[in-house]
């Protein structure tokens, strides 16, 4: 992390021991806000208007041609965007090696950080924020600009907690009917067509991201996430996500209409504005009128604020040069002072609501005087004697190496030195007996010295787990791979897993509900057991379940909270589509934390599918995990399968193959406890498609069915043909007497009383237990 002191030491020989502030042009640098690989963001204050700004300092020497073009395009887009909910561009300064972008400073930071610290928003708060986001995105689309990286990290909050849309690095121009083909964005917020590598319409891409953003605002978690990018890609393509119980039906409907897999069937911005959830608060409809807020910002069209121009002229700034800068969109010092003063004027009006009823000619002189009294213009800009422009921005002097190491990191020593220099706070000696020309006052004083230096280091962020509460509706789950010899794995294979959902749908995948679910149900088979956080008696906090972080970029694990609380019953307040999870399956484990920050990527279409990734993991499992067990002879055939044959399998075949490997592992682990048990020949028995009982104590398959060298696909196929007889519907059980080795479970059967080594599907209702058969 680059640390730069707010003040710099005075060069030796001055005879003064005080420290002097650093300055970039007309901006006094205060501190570092953040940095990346080739850029650093500084907080600075304009010396004339006393307004805080953010200066993004970019090292052009460390950018290739494509990234440099991206930076210039971002600047070009920001010059065209003048909206109260979009970060305002004030000034652009450029040297041979450096680029300085001065923008509006949002003092309350990112919406992402706000959610990680305070939890999810109420729907009323989320509606207000979403109206502002929608207004900014609609303004961009009306100007044929698509953002393509909408996420909570790019939504900033100003001093009034209003939204400011930022970071147009992936933005671009678009024309209706001409699709785009740059597959970029942040994976959790990216649309399905980006992962598939299809051409897309820009607005439809932003609407999908808007749906994810609204979900995050209301829920405090991501709708689509996964331990890796292939898993995340699969979930996005399926369009399935979970809805918490506290979300209203109208909000759920709006989110589902935005998160539609088929982009042609997604809701439009005009339809979003007319949605019932958006229209629930009439006061927000009256505030959504940017016409008044945009007064004075459309200066390139000749709409100038005469009040601001009068203030600048009173300060000695040439009016004609200011107007020319605004007309040409130069974004130099003249334009920067104009826009900063305009912002100050708006703040002054907002603090005096009664002034709107006063006639404009009567209050205009009062506002001008108040603005002039609060500007605190430095002494060097007052008219005196003529002076050389170099005195306003002298060439940087060489400082001692020890001073540089104590104040400026090695990266900023060379990259920022052309613009940073010690400034004497008492400028009376420099400008004594000299007059100042308004024209030379605002010349861009930037040194054109070349620079060389090492690369910038990345700043490490402090990662903190967030408190949360329980209570969430679960409609999708994964299979837990954590089991013990006494509790062998049960893998549920759904026939719809390998089938893509119908276009234009966004449905849940419901699992059977267990009426006897308790604290042990959700915590038994989790990689990180327990739940995080506490619940508020006033309003529900964000319901985070503690476990491994599902962010595909960082993949960090969550810590346990200070207090482990039992899960809230899912039976209270559930709608007809609400479901919960059976024991042994992973619960909903997404949470929005500081270490879950996502980054934008190019080439999301190059992410491999889930089937290929599962295949590779099965290869590693067969080579590493099986080597610790004394497996029977057929396992050599499983290990000898070539990679090329695995790559051609479908997702269902790979899941069956993994099920077979897990069964063999468990069978080998517990076989030593049953060496004296009689070996019973298997009896063909017809089961329903949902039957998934594992037999521990008898051979899993007859010896003739498992031959050395048999492929796992053929083994799984014979398993289905010989024993399961899976069909489209449930098959009736035989009415004759059952063999002695087979008994039917009674509804009152207690699973805890089973002999060691026996297993069954856990958390089943009484009606479901009657349809399963336990093999003893």
UniProtKB/Swiss-Prot annotation:
Tree of life domain: Eukaryota
Residue positions binding ATP: 33-41, 56
Catalytic residues (UniProt): 149 (proton acceptor)
Domain Protein kinase residue range list: 27-278
Keywords (A to Z) from UniProt: ATP-binding, Biological rhythms, Cell cycle, Cytoplasm, Developmental protein, Differentiation, Kinase, Magnesium, Metal-binding, Nucleotide-binding, Nucleus, Phosphoprotein, Serine/threonine-protein kinase, Transferase, Tumor suppressor
Sequence segments annotated as region (Disordered): 350-371, 449-472, 621-643
Post-translational modification: Phosphorylated at Thr-182 by STK11/LKB1 in complex with STE20-related adapter-alpha (STRADA) pseudo kinase and CAB39, leading to its activation. Phosphorylation at Thr-182 promotes autophosphorylation at Ser-186, which is required for sustained activity. Autophosphorylation at Ser-186 is maintained by sequential phosphorylation at Thr-182 by GSK3-beta. GSK3-beta cannot initiate phosphorylation at Thr-182, it can only maintain it. Phosphorylation at Ser-577 by PKA promotes translocation to the cytoplasm.
Region (RK-rich region): 586-612
EC numbers for this chain: 2.7.11.1
Pfam family, one: UBA_SIK3
Activity regulation, free text: Activated by phosphorylation on Thr-182. Also activated by phosphorylation on Thr-322 in response to increases in intracellular sodium in parallel with elevations in intracellular calcium through the reversible sodium/calcium exchanger.
UniProt GO MF annotations: 14-3-3 protein binding; ATP binding; cAMP response element binding protein binding; histone deacetylase binding; magnesium ion binding; protein kinase binding; protein serine kinase activity; protein serine/threonine kinase activity
SMART domains hit by this protein: S_TKc
Gene Ontology BP, a term: regulation of sodium ion transport
Expression induction or repression: By high salt diet and depolarization in brain.
Domain (UBA) ranges: 303-343
Compartments where located: Cytoplasm; Nucleus
Modified residues (Phosphothreonine): 182, 322
Cofactor: Mg(2+)
Catalysed transformations (reactions): L-seryl-[protein] + ATP = O-phospho-L-seryl-[protein] + ADP + H(+); L-threonyl-[protein] + ATP = O-phospho-L-threonyl-[protein] + ADP + H(+)
Family the entry assigns: Belongs to the protein kinase superfamily. CAMK Ser/Thr protein kinase family. AMPK subfamily.
Record note on quaternary structure: Interacts (when phosphorylated on Thr-182 and Ser-186) with YWHAZ. Interacts with ATP1A1.
Domain description: The RK-rich region determines the subcellular location.
Function: Serine/threonine-protein kinase involved in various processes such as cell cycle regulation, gluconeogenesis and lipogenesis regulation, muscle growth and differentiation and tumor suppression. Phosphorylates HDAC4, HDAC5, PPME1, SREBF1, CRTC1/TORC1 and CRTC2/TORC2. Acts as a tumor suppressor and plays a key role in p53/TP53-dependent anoikis, a type of apoptosis triggered by cell detachment: required for phosphorylation of p53/TP53 in response to loss of adhesion and is able to suppress metastasis.
Name of the molecule in the record: Serine/threonine-protein kinase SIK1
Gene expressing this chain: Sik1
């Amino acid at each position: 992390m680059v640390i730069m002191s707010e003040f710099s030491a005075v060069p030796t020989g001055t005879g003064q021991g005080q420290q002097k502030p650093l300055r970039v042009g007309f901006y006094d640098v205060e501190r570092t806000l953040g940095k990346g690989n080739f850029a650093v963001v500084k907080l600075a204050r304009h010396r004339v208007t006393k307004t805080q700004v953010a200066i993004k300092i970019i090292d052009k020497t460390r950018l290739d041609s494509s990234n440099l073009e991206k930076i210039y395009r971002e600047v070009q887009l920001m010059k065209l965007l003048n909206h109260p909910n979009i970060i305002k561009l004030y000034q652009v300064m450029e040297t041979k090696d450096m680029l300085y972008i001065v923008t509006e400073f949002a003092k309350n930071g990112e919406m992402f950080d706000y959610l990680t610290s305070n939890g999810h928003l109420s729907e009323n708060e989320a509606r207000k924020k979403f109206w502002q986001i929608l207004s900014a995105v609609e303004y961009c689309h009306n100007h044929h600009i698509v953002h393509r990286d909408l996420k909570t990290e790019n939504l900033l909050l100003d001093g009034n907690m209003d939204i400011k849309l930022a970071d147009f690095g992936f933005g671009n121009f678009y024309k209706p009917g001409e699709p785009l083909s740059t597959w970029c964005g942040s994976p959790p917020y990216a649309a399905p067509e980006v992962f598939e590598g299809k051409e897309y319409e820009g607005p439809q891409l932003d609407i999908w991201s808007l749906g994810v953003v609204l979900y995050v605002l209301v829920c405090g978690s991501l709708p689509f996430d996964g331990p890796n990018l292939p898993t995340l890609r699969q979930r996005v393509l399926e369009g399935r996500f979970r809805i918490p119980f506290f979300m209203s039906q109208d909000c759920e409907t709006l989110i589902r209409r935005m998160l539609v897999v088929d982009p042609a069937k997604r809701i439009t911005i005009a339809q979003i504005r007319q949605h019932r959830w958006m229209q629930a608060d009439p006061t927000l409809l009256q505030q959504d009128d940017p016409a008044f807020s945009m007064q004075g910002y459309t200066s390139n069209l000749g709409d100038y604020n005469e009040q601001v121009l009068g203030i600048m002229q009173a300060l000695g700034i040439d009016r004609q040069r200011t107007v020319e800068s605004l007309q040409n969109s130069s974004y130099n010092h003249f334009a920067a002072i104009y826009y900063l003063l305009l912002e100050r004027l708006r703040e002054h009006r907002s603090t005096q609501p009664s002034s709107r009823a006063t006639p404009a000619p009567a209050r205009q002189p009062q506002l001008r005087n108040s603005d002039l009294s609060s500007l605190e213009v430095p002494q060097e800009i007052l008219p005196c004697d003529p002076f050389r422009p170099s005195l306003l921005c002298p060439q940087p002097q060489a400082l001692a190496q020890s001073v540089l190491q104590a104040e400026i990191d090695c990266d900023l020593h060379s990259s920022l030195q052309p613009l940073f220099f010690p400034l004497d706070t008492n400028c009376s000696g420099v400008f004594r007996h000299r007059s100042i020309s308004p024209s030379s006052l605002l010349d861009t004083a930037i040194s054109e010295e070349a620079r060389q230096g090492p690369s910038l280091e990345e700043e490490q962020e402090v990662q903190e787990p967030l408190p949360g509460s329980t209570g969430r509706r679960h409609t999708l789950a994964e299979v837990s791979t954590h089991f013990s010899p006494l509790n062998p794995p049960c893998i549920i294979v759904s026939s719809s897993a390998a089938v893509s959902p119908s276009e234009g749908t966004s449905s849940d995948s419901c699992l059977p509900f267990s009426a006897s679910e308790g604290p042990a149900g959700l915590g038994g088979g989790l990689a990180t057991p327990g739940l995080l956080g506490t619940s508020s008696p006033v309003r529900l906090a964000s319901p985070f379940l503690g476990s491994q972080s599902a962010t595909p970029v960082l993949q960090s694990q969550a810590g346990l909270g200070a207090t482990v609380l039992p899960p809230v019953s899912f039976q209270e307040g559930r709608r007809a589509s609400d479901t919960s999870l059976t024991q042994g399956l992973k619960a909903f484990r997404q949470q929005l934390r500081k270490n879950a920050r996502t980054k934008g990527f190019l080439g999301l279409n190059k992410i491999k599918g889930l089937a290929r990734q599962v295949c590779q993991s099965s290869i590693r499992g067969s080579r590493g995990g099986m080597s610790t067990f004394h497996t029977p002879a057929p396992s050599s055939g499983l290990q000898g399968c070539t990679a090329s044959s695995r790559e051609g399998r479908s997702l269902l075949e790979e899941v069956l193959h993994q099920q077979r490997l897990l069964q063999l592992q468990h069978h080998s682990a517990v076989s030593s406890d049953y060496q004296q048990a009689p070996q019973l020949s298997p009896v063909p028995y017809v089961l329903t498609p949902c039957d998934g009982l594992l037999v521990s104590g008898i051979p899993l398959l007859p010896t003739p069915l498992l031959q050395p060298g048999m492929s796992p696909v053929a083994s799984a196929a014979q398993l289905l043909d010989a024993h399961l007889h899976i069909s489209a519907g449930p098959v009736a059980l035989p009415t004759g007497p059952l063999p002695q080795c087979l008994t039917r479970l009674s509804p009152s059967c207690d699973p805890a009383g089973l002999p060691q080594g026996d297993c069954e599907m856990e958390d089943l209702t009484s009606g479901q237990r009657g349809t399963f058969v336990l093999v003893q």
